[in-house]
Amino acid sequence: MRCGLCPHRCLIPEQERGICKVRENRGGRLFALTYGKVSAVQFDPVEKKPLYHFHPGRPILSIGSVGCNFHCGFCQNYHLVECSVPLSPMPIPDLVRAARREGAVGISYTYNEPLIGFEFVMDCAREFRRAGMANVLVTNGYVLPEPLAELLPLVDAMNIDLKSMDPEFYRKICGGTLAPVLDTIRESAKSTHVEITTLLVTGENDSEESIRAVVDFVAGVDPEIPLHFSRYTPMYRFTAPSTPPARLAAAHRIAREKLPYVYVGNYPLEGAENTVCPSCGAVVVRRHGYRTDRFGLAGNRCVSCSAVLRFVV
């Protein structure tokens, strides 16, 4: 039985599972083993996804399960990838009620790779759309065009990991390929709000050349896509030291040459969390950790100069 969800296109023998560990061949049919089962449910600031230009300051219901179709040696959630945490059943109506009760903007499919649980995400997304709430994907983007096209009409925002522009990085470190991720970014940016995150791993993808390659790609898709550089810390199989602050500052400086919305996460780099109006230079959103003050925004316009900014509010 061949799976048609992600570019691995796993050929799965009877009673066995694909690379993601959550899709099993039973009698010539694929079963989604984690359907309706979650490893974590909590409310987060939407900035934690990270999404800085999508309903800033609002809470969002965040859910995750287990498994992944990548196996990155530096994974920050490796316990979920290895399916080593307990799962609890979670009916979709309960999620809708919880989000509504807490005044959440919607739901975020996050923590592990959500697209390997495609069927549950689809069903959940339909119910949240009917309830008038948003659907957010935090994803590695490793999905085939057909399922992506089916899901995108239900998606209101995405944060997509772009780990590197080096195909060898994806092959050796992640166990995947780069091209499908780039295709996902290009296609998603046509129809929904997209932000990009690059984890800068010391000695692997933090050179100036690597950073410029990421920036050039994002600028080529749409220069107004917000780009987040995140600080790596030693985790799982990687023991290299944490990303030096100087590299984070350099990445921010390099990216700002071509992109107006560039941020640094997991490290308090002065000014690198705030949003500045590209037209007049005024600070429109000030952030400290996950605390957000959108004092300079009126809707999606700059209060100082009335320029329309790339925000969904």
Tell where the protein language model's regions lie, with residue ranges.
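Auxiliary Fe-S-binding modules of radical SAM enzymes
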Residues: 1-15, 204-313
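N-terminal [4Fe-4S]-dependent radical SAM core
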Residues: 1-65, 77-82, 273, 283-285, ...
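Core alpha-helical elements of the protein kinase catalytic domain
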Residues: 4, 66, 70-73, 126, ...
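Fold-independent oxyanion-binding glycine-rich loops
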Residues: 23, 65-66, 78, 110-113, ...
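Short secondary-structure boundary/capping segments
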Residues: 52-53, 149, 294
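Glycine-rich active-site/cofactor-binding loop and its immediate structural neighborhood
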Residues: 60-66, 70-103, 108
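Conserved AdoMet/S-adenosylmethionine-binding subsite of the radical SAM
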Residues: 92-243
